[in-house]
Regions:
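Ribonuclease/tRNase effector modules and their secretory precursors
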Residues: 1-84
Length: 84
């Protein structure tokens, strides 16, 4: 599995949320038990929850036909504190 993302979106996330897709990938690789769940808002997407800067963050993504993950965005979510 390869994890991909849009470079422009990554720069926007760094500037606006102080979070990068590189941090997400590091967290996913460090915790192999990261389980994709169906995104309740977008049925064609999945989500996973990772901890960035000691705070839970939701990462929506799509799984491509070859099994690669394409990250859409990442956002902090206090509602997920109990999940980590």
């Amino acid at each position: 599995m390869i994890i991909k993302w849009n470079k422009e979106k990554d720069e926007l996330l760094k500037a606006t949320r102080n979070i990068s897709f590189e941090q997400v990938v590091e967290e996913i690789n460090a915790h192999r038990n990261t389980k994709p769940e169906t995104n309740p808002v977008h049925q064609n997407q999945f989500i996973t929850v990772v901890k960035i800067n000691n705070y839970p963050c939701v990462v929506p993504f799509v799984i491509e036909e070859n099994g690669d993950w394409f990250l859409k965005t990442v956002y902090p979510c206090r509602k997920m504190k109990g999940r980590l």
